[in-house]
Design a protein with these regions (language model features):
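Solvent-exposed loop/turn and edge beta-strand elements of beta-rich ligand-binding domains
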Residues: 1, 13-15, 42-57, 106-108, ...
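Short, low-structural-confidence N-terminal segments
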Residues: 1-83, 87, 217-229, 244, ...
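N-terminal targeting/tethering segments
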Residues: 25-165
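Extracytoplasmic
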Residues: 30-38, 80, 187, 230-237, ...
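Second-shell loop/turn segments in exported
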Residues: 33-39, 71-86, 97-106, 154, ...
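Solvent-exposed aromatic/hydrophobic patches embedded in short alpha-helical segments
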Residues: 73-103, 111-122, 144, 148-149, ...
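Secretory-pathway/luminal and periplasmic proteins that interact with or process carbohydrate-rich
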Residues: 121-133, 203-207, 326-334
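Proteostasis/folding factors centered on peptidyl-prolyl cis-trans isomerases
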Residues: 137-171, 175-178, 192-193, 197-272, ...
Length: 435
């Protein structure tokens, strides 16, 4: 059975886009009305209306994902969608004309094969998306369901395999046009160095007096940090976590302490209530202390075994991969290779972890088991020191050059296409969308 979807709202769009009049029109003739013409290429009213429907459908889906309202009956919303679609078709017509002028509009056999493969992938992706959103409860067989969704996409969205193929061809043609436009665009070494200096100064301004932010950026996977502040250490850890049942017992007892404290802090609590809350808090604290002691006792042997293995010469990384219960130290994680970046007084880490690390004297030192009320036991390795100062230019030069070149190429291409659109002799009849 097909689920109710946003299409129910969008079925009214053709009426909104072509308002009712007392004069009845032949639907086929009306749909064939030219809206845009450039040379011998045209875009009809039917095509515009279908594209606007699709544009608004996609926007409605996007807004719905974030629980935002998107009123498909709002004239301003409709007008905005129309403008977006019309500008896209003007750009497309100008590009097609230029591709033909440059002799780039014909595909080779290899390019045609690539277009077909891309079209099939795109069509299947759209089919799967609609299957998931609108046909999730369908009991139809696979082939029958595929046929129904294919028909649905054509009727409701104006999307067919032929359209997917034409779109894929257009992408390849535009790629050829773009290559011809940007082939002479370059970036000099001086420009790369200037960009490097700018990024270094920006990073220095951001991080020189805020090592915690640098550490957070590093630990979160920021690919390139152009300046490293002083005082950053790298640390790996073998975390021995509390047993689940012990963690649950501590959480329950802690909740009782918090509840009793809330009564003590409340201005409208009576003396009798406060007296009872004091007793409840004391009992809950005793319960919490006992639960915590039991929790540590239940993991003491595991932590001691790790320390014994290390004392016996076990390889740290091998043992960490086997024993640590910290996901950040799992094989394949960047932080497992380098260690966490940590600075003193860093609040995004447990203070027991930070203090334990900075109590170690030299790189390579390993702590004893360090008790954490939050997680269990930390066994910490002082892995290294981050080198203060800017990242080496040679290590980022290639990436910087690529980034600058891509940005410049896109700017040159966009400006060039905008010029083609501006210079094109379009014939427009936008009034036909209103009657």
């Amino acid at each position: 059975m097909k689920k109710k979807s946003l299409l129910g709202f969008l079925m009214i769009l053709p009426l909104l886009l072509s308002s009712c009049t007392l004069i009845k029109k032949d639907a086929a003739v009306d749909a064939a009305t030219e809206i845009i013409r450039l040379g011998d290429r045209t875009v009809t009213k039917g095509t515009i209306v279908s594209s606007v429907n699709q544009q608004m459908y996609q926007m409605a889906q996007l807004y719905a994902q974030f629980n935002y309202s998107y009123d498909v009956t709002d004239p301003e919303v409709i007008a905005d969608a129309q403008n977006t679609v019309i500008n896209a078709y003007k750009r497309d017509l100008a590009l097609r004309a230029k591709a033909e002028e440059l002799g780039l509009d014909q595909l080779t056999e290899e390019e045609e094969a690539q277009a077909k493969a891309d079209a099939e992938e795109s069509f299947q992706s759209n089919l799967d998306q609609i299957r998931e959103s609108e046909y999730a409860d369908s009991t139809l067989g696979e082939e029958e369901l595929k046929a129904e969704i294919t028909e649905h996409m054509e009727k409701e969205h104006g999307y067919t395999m032929e359209i997917a193929l034409n779109n894929a061809r257009d992408v390849i043609v535009e790629g050829k046009v773009k290559d011809s436009v940007i082939k002479d665009v370059t970036v000099s070494d001086e420009e790369v160095e200037a960009e490097y200096n700018t990024r270094v100064e920006t990073a220095k301004s951001n991080y020189e007096d805020d090592a915690s932010s640098w550490c957070s950026a590093f630990n979160n996977g920021t690919s390139t940090l152009y300046y490293t502040p002083a005082g950053v250490r790298y640390a790996k850890q073998i975390l021995i976590k509390f047993k689940d049942e012990d963690q649950a017992a501590m959480t329950a007892a802690s909740g009782k302490v918090t509840a009793a404290q809330a009564i003590l802090d409340a201005e409208d609590s009576t003396e009798e209530q406060k007296t009872q809350a004091e007793a409840d808090k004391a009992a809950a604290q005793a319960e919490l202390d006992a639960a915590k002691a039991a929790a540590f006792a239940n993991i003491d042997a595991d932590a001691d075994a790790v320390l014994a293995d290390l004392a016996g010469g076990a390889d740290w990384d091998t043992l960490m991969a086997e024993k640590s219960q910290d996901p950040g130290m799992a094989s394949g994680r960047k932080t497992a290779e380098t260690g966490y970046a940590v600075c003193e007084n860093m609040t995004s880490f447990d203070s027991a972890f930070v203090n334990g690390l900075f109590a170690l004297e030299k790189v390579g030192d390993v702590s004893e088991k360090i008790a954490s009320d939050l997680y269990g036991y930390y066994i910490i390795q002082y892995t290294g020191d981050a080198v203060e100062g800017p990242v080496a230019l040679d290590s980022v030069k290639e990436d910087l050059h690529s980034s600058l070149l891509t940005t410049r190429q896109n700017t040159v291409y966009d400006d060039t296409v905008s010029g083609w659109v501006e210079a094109a002799d379009f014939k427009l009849d936008l009034s036909a969308l209103k009657d």
